[in-house]
Each structure stands twice: as structure tokens, then as C-alpha cells.
Amino acid sequence: MSLEEKLNKYSNKLSMTNNLNKIDVYNKKINKYKERQIYSNLKKPQPIDESVISLYSLKNEYQKSPDKMTALGFGVTDVGKPVELLVFDRKKPTNNEVSIEIYYTGICHSDWHFIVGEWKADFPLIPGHELIGRVIDIGPNVDKYSIGDIVCVSPVIDSCGHCKMCTHHIEQHCMNGATEIYNQKTRLPGDIKPSGPITYGGYSNIVIIKQHFVYKFPKNLDIERCAPLMCAGATTYSPLRQAKVGPGMKVGIVGIGGLGHIAVKIAKAMGAHVVAITRTEWKFKDSVNNLGANESILSTNVWQMNQHKGSFDFILSTIPMAHDIVPYIELLKYKATICTVGELFPTVINGMDLAQHPCFLQSSLIAGSDEIKEMLAFCSEHNIMPDVQIIKADKINDTRQKLLESKAKYRYVIDIRASLNK
């Protein structure tokens, strides 16, 4: 049965019933198939020459159709290919959705995991899951935002809204599958589990997001620096908060990169004695001189590591690749906790090492909507902002090697508007 036939079927059923429950069911079906019909007519990302960027004015494209618009983004058409300019369609905002013109998008190491095929992805792929921009349109029933508001978006942009995780605002752990801003199935009206087309992320000039997953940006922070708060900030704030980090605690931050450097600032603002643990010489110095750590350790220096054995109350590891965590477990006090947030790869741990160094090993994934609001308020109160390097999109392909070589200071952020003003 075609979408048109399904729409006619439920429209006819709706016209022939007075049962309120059935009316609700039929309306949900109609809305779902209408939205699916819109999505079926959207063009997928495809390469375009940069010389024609000026033909795709956001203002002009937005006015051409009641249901969709042409968008520009930066992504890849297949695994391992270079990031390039792509053109594609976005739908316009419908119920409870806002349309955001993207100003700045951070480059997370996980973006590269997908681009190069270290993690499974659907192609074409437009990455980007930490972004800041301006509301340019709102759909029906939007009551939290107005046109012109400066807002930010994190990786999770939808969830079922009904399960135990969602009702406790831990939407990233939705029991029916959270939808992330890219490389995930869209949740259509009436869906419990997402069944729609693949999402495209923030390396683009516009995005449509449900208002529940949009966050007001604190006015006292710098807009060009703070896109990474929406992933790196949320991902590190959540486990630090849940560990009740505070005065009198010795806290280690392992891996001083995009996540770790923000974690140092957050843990310090929480009142802890913060020790930065890194393998990189310049970060060993910069962690204390610039980021505010009380001490730093070179993880490659056995003597330095030995001096701190058995002394940490909590360790947060942000290393974004498979590695041996035993040297860090040995730094913990008896039955203290180490939390890993960067390493989402298979890890082998010898049970004897855990037996000899009893500890709690845990992980964490981004943050729920309430914690993200808390994180933004906390960073606003303590004037915490990421240290970033602003780039244009034509430099995206250079960033992976620099990240691998620990040359980024500390997060790359794409200036989307400057990238498209050619």
C-alpha cells in the first residue's frame, strides 16, 4: 500500500468515527504518513561545486517550498572519502520543532570514527553533534523559543518520551532507542522505536530539532567557543556530578583533549584537587599553567605514575581509543571509581588486575536533558569555556591527523557561516 493510499485510508476512517480514542489513533497515523511522505521527497546529500554556494541563499531557499528547503553541509559520500561540500534537503519545522541556522559546530573525535569506518555508519554522512546557532523559524506549539534566540544542541535530539529513562530525563538511554543528530533513524510521529530516514548532523547550515532537545545558550559565554560544551562538556560534567566531586577529593583526568581539558575546568570549579594525566609534554605543562589543574602527570613517566599510586578518589578517563586502563586503576584508592567516557572500543581487562586493585569500573554516555541544562548553568556561573581553534570547513580534512598527534588545542570548531560565505 502506498503512502497516499494509507493517508486516504485513515482519513476516511477519521471521517466516519466519533470515538475519541480512535480519532487520536487515526490522527497520529495521518501525521506519521504525512511526515513520511515529506521525507520520501527529500533529496539525500550529494556533492556540489563550491562555486555555486551563492545560489543557495538560506533565506531564498527557505521560501521556495512549504514543506522543505535546500540545505548545504559538509560530509562524506562513502567510508574513508574526504569531507566535501554537499547539497541536500531538510524538512521545515512541524509540531514542537524549531529551525536553527547553525553558526558553529565542534569537531568531536567520534565524528572521525564514523567518517573513516572505525564505527559503523550509513552513507552519505553529515557529522556534527555539538552546535550553536540562531532560531529562524518555529513550528506549531513551540512555546519555549522565539525567532532570534541563540540556542545550542547536543548529540541526542529525540527519544520515545515514555520509558523509565525518558521520564527521568535520561533520554540518551531511552529504552526504545534514542535518536542522535546524525547517523540515526528519525523518529516519526507515533513511533515508539524510530523508523524514519537517517539523520544528518551539524556540519551544515541549518537543522530542525524538537524544542525539548534545544537549549538556551548562556548570554555571558562566548558563542564562538562553546559548541563543544554540548558534547564534551555534557559528557564530562555528568560523571563528575554523579560522583559528587567536590572539596577534599583528589580527582584525576586522563587524556587532556577535547573532553579532558573541559573536565579539568569543571572538576576544579567543583572544588576538587585536580590532577591532569597526559602522555603529551606540552599538555603536561599547559594543564597547570592554563587549564587550572593543581598538578599534572606524564603517563609515560613511570616514576611520576608511581608517586601517585593508591591516592585518587575518582578518575575520569577521556582517552578516545582502546588502551590499557590498569596503570590508571593502580592510581585509585581502595574501592574508588574510574569512569571511562572516551573509549568506546572493546577493552580487555585481566581479572587478576582487578582483584589486586579492587575498584569500581563504570562508564557514562553524554548526559540527559536536565543535566545538560545544569551543565550550561554551571559553566555560565563559573565562566567555563572550551579552548578552541576556529577553522573553516576546507580545513576539516586536516584535523584527524592533528588530533591523532595531539596537536589540537583543544577542540576544533567549524565556523559554518564563514565557510559558506565564499
UniProtKB/Swiss-Prot annotation:
One of its GO terms (molecular function) is zinc ion binding. Keywords: Host cytoplasm, Metal-binding, Oxidoreductase, Virion, Zinc. The keyword Oxidoreductase applies. Zn(2+) 1 binds at C108, H129, C231. PROSITE patterns: ADH_ZINC. It is found in: Host cytoplasm; Virion. Gene3D superfamilies: Medium-chain alcohol dehydrogenases, catalytic domain, NAD(P)-binding Rossmann-like Domain. Its EC number is 1.-.-.-. This is Probable zinc-type alcohol dehydrogenase-like protein L498. It comes from Acanthamoeba polyphaga mimivirus.
